[in-house]
């Protein structure tokens, strides 16, 4: 599905009745959050606020408010089609050698397409149609959303942060929230294991005391945004992956004040630097857990240049108790993760991140069990294979006769196939999201694995129960009689 930028995607949504323009004056202080939250919970459209109080710039919200819109942003017509995206990533992550000449010929188009999607650099970029620098930089002119009553300040939420570590060709793209600190200051909240933070750490080691170049794109196209939150193999840039999603090369342009390349068709670009040692207290903010997080210190991002398109659109969101946009993203990306996990663990049948589990904190896995202890191997694999699951606190493993997406099925398996002492695995002192205030130490906590599979010899000495199943003949006979019986007729 070809679209070049956010505006193309907005037009596509409007054609499909998936976008609502709001002309009434709406305050970015709390009101946009409340309207967006109600709309998302009703599985409503993306929202374009065209009359934002105190600003002449429209705000786009609830863009990824349904799994189908996430799929559309990734170039697919349905959520189930995202399995194909996952299969492509699994292939790129661990490509298998061709089994013969014919297989090699069949693989050629796939390799050719991947190699042809390197980003295209252009000079006269739409994102640099208007340029402000020095004293003209004033971030308060942006309609930055103040999401919750207890939030300390307005918060940039969909900023696509572009960094590059020393001696690295590939740039890193990441989504990190940024607290408004002043007219030209933001706080860059990135966790220590994220790509941007790692680039910064390496820079400080290689260039002590020198400013670290950073750029942030606001209002990038959906494929590029989603590429930044997808487990793209290290051999492939997020820009190239975005090109694969939308079936057209990502156009980029070099920043005015540094050598970073940003999406050429983004709505707004912030350019600047992080001064090593310049830190500020970030938070509290309402987060995806449904609670306000604790205050912590993060680097300060000083903005030296703001460039933007003519009549720019500001893209925003909020996070709160699920469901919110991160939870919806989790539901959609769940389908991308499954082929990646199956590549490493073919015995996995399904994998589910319930949205009420705050996107990633609880996972349910169903599998074709083959030997004693197999369930424990799979739960350990979930925690270790993809970095996206290093913060998953609970993993429940069931047999393939259980529907991972039906709590009635999962709870039945847990209560009939588990002994709490034997089948619960606790792992202490593991990485935990620092926003998880339930952990005893910030950033360090425990994990629980639950083996809700049928037990094999070696796992139990008792005779194991056999599930009750009606015979097919009787079921067929009753199917034929059912309408005639009129049991459900009032």
Curated annotation (Swiss-Prot):
It is a peripheral membrane protein. It catalyses: a 4-hydroxy-3-(all-trans-polyprenyl)benzoate + H(+) = a 2-(all-trans-polyprenyl)phenol + CO2. Transmembrane segments: none annotated. It is an enzyme of class 4 (lyase). GO terms for cellular component: cytosol; plasma membrane. Its cofactor is prenylated FMN; Mn(2+). One of its GO terms (biological process) is ubiquinone biosynthetic process. Pathway: Cofactor biosynthesis; ubiquinone biosynthesis. It is found in: Cell membrane. Its EC number is 4.1.1.98. Prenylated FMN binds at residues 175-177, 189-191, 194-195. GO terms for molecular function: 3-octaprenyl-4-hydroxybenzoate carboxy-lyase activity; metal ion binding. It comes from the Bacteria. The keyword Cell membrane applies. The active site is at residue 287. Binds 1 prenylated FMN per subunit. Catalyzes the decarboxylation of 3-octaprenyl-4-hydroxy benzoate to 2-octaprenylphenol, an intermediate step in ubiquinone biosynthesis. Homohexamer. Belongs to the UbiD family. This is 3-octaprenyl-4-hydroxybenzoate carboxy-lyase. It comes from Idiomarina loihiensis (strain ATCC BAA-735 / DSM 15497 / L2-TR). The gene is ubiD.
